UniProtKB/Swiss-Prot annotation:
Gene3D superfamilies: mk0293 like domain, Transcriptional regulatory protein pf0864 domain like. This is Putative nickel insertion protein. Belongs to the LarC family. It comes from the Bacteria. It comes from Wolinella succinogenes (strain ATCC 29543 / DSM 1740 / CCUG 13145 / JCM 31913 / LMG 7466 / NCTC 11488 / FDC 602W) (Vibrio succinogenes). Keywords: Nickel. PANTHER family: NICKEL INSERTION PROTEIN-RELATED, PYRIDINIUM-3,5-BISTHIOCARBOXYLIC ACID MONONUCLEOTIDE NICKEL INSERTION PROTEIN. InterPro entries: Ni_insertion. It holds the Pfam family Ni_insertion. GO terms for molecular function: lyase activity; nickel cation binding.
């Protein structure tokens, strides 16, 4: 499994994150091409340089603003409309908007303002829009299946912003990171910004200081701080996660011959809501040639008790069969493919490095088909051609 690990010993900011992504292999030209889909032409320049931090080579990404362009008070509504109206892929839009929403909600609570009216003094500035949307682009380009992170160093001291002098961590940063593992005063400056906090809060699947990793590539992104004891860098580790035994699963089954279809359907909904991995019904014939339904529930062991209780509450069953099972599954990863109507996410099923089958994300296809009034099968034919072309290019 391809994973990404954030080592946040010196915190994280938007520019550090972009630098680490570029250092890890996301092409700067690709970022520039994708970011050009936002209506910000002529307002900024994006550059990357190699620097040294405490003797460690790192990539520093900078967003240089054109002085005649200033929109420091864009609202969340303005930013959302900008992203939604762009030609970015659906997955990139969703990832970027999730991060902006997180920051907007934090600012809304802190300043007691309606969400849509929150003025993004810093996040609404062009450089922060580039940081967040660029992060979404870079993460999608890496195509990782899981994202993990260490404890997040926040720093200490004070920071000057649009609202005056504030203690570190800034209120928005702390609000965003509620419930997540943090460290305070490890460095005498603002180590983690609200943008960096949102990147972690919205994209990391799990926080852990120790993971069984097999590193494949390491990227270092440089911050602006100089002359500090701890290097002001973010370290990203692209790795393969060693194959772990899959969690034990249990198959619960019962035969039912005296319930209405409506009640059975409701029971299935309850089981899915409670965390069943799969629930399915099979028509069967029982003793005395009675027509019946076999209800099958696939569950993780830690959900078995709750699902069993729901089964007895919502069905007429007075007993069930139980069998522990193991699942074998192909590795999966996502790619973005172009069509005449927009980009679509496609899930590849892999055996080693070989793609054995692929499937487009249905909801994205449905939206494109409805938006552009194109037959769904026509869209799928275009996707087939795009995927085959992409795979042929990769093989060559």
């Amino acid at each position: 499994m391809k994973i990404l690990y954030y080592d946040c010993f010196s915190g994280i900011s938007g520019d550090m994150h972009l630098g680490a992504l570029v250092d890890l292999g996301v092409e700067l030209e690709y970022l520039q091409k994708e970011l050009a889909k936002l209506p910000l032409e002529g307002e900024y320049e994006l550059s990357a340089t190699t620097v040294s931090k405490s003797g460690i080579r790192a990539t520093q990404v900078k967003v240089k603003l054109r002085e005649h362009h200033h929109h420091d008070h864009r609202t969340f509504g303005n930013i959302r409309a900008m992203i939604l109206s762009s030609a970015l892929s659906l997955r990139i839009k969703e990832r970027a908007l999730k991060m902006f929403q997180k920051i907007a909600e934090a600012e809304s609570r802190i300043h007691a303002k309606p969400l849509e009216q929150v003025a993004f003094h810093e996040v609404g500035a062009i450089d922060s829009i580039i940081d967040i949307v660029g992060s979404a682009i870079g993460l999608e380009a890496l195509g990782v299946e899981k994202i993990y992170a260490s404890r997040i160093e926040l720093g200490g001291g004070f920071v000057r912003c649009a609202h005056g002098l504030l203690p570190v961590p800034a209120p928005a940063t702390l609000e965003i990171l509620q419930g997540l593992p943090i460290g305070l005063h490890g460095v005498p400056f603002e180590a983690t910004t609200p943008t960096g906090a949102a990147i972690l809060a919205c994209n990391v699947d799990s926080f852990s200081g120790s993971l069984p990793l097999s590193p494949q590539k390491i990227g270092y992104g440089a911050g602006e701080r100089e002359g500090v004891d701890i290097p002001n860098i973010l370290r990203l580790i692209l790795a393969d996660e060693p194959v772990q035994p899959s969690p034990k699963e249990v198959l619960l089954e019962t035969n039912i011959d005296d319930m209405s279809p409506e009640h059975l359907a409701y029971a299935v909904e309850r089981l899915f809501e409670a965390g069943a991995l799969d629930v399915y019904m099979t028509p069967i014939t029982t003793k005395k040639n009675r027509l019946a339904t076999k209800l099958s529930i696939l569950s993780l062991l830690d959900k078995e008790r709750e699902l069993t209780q729901i089964l007895f509450q919502e069905t007429s069953s007075i007993g069930l069969r139980r069998l522990e099972v193991e699942k074998i599954a192909l590795a999966r990863r996502f790619i973005q493919v172009p069509t005449p109507w927009g980009e679509v996410s496609v899930k590849l099923s892999m055996q080693g490095e070989k793609v054995v089958r692929y499937k487009a994300e249905y909801e994205e296809c449905r939206r494109l088909a409805m938006t552009h009034s194109v037959p769904l099968h026509t869209l799928y034919l275009a996707i087939d051609k795009a995927v085959e072309s992409c795979l042929n290019d990769t093989n060559h």
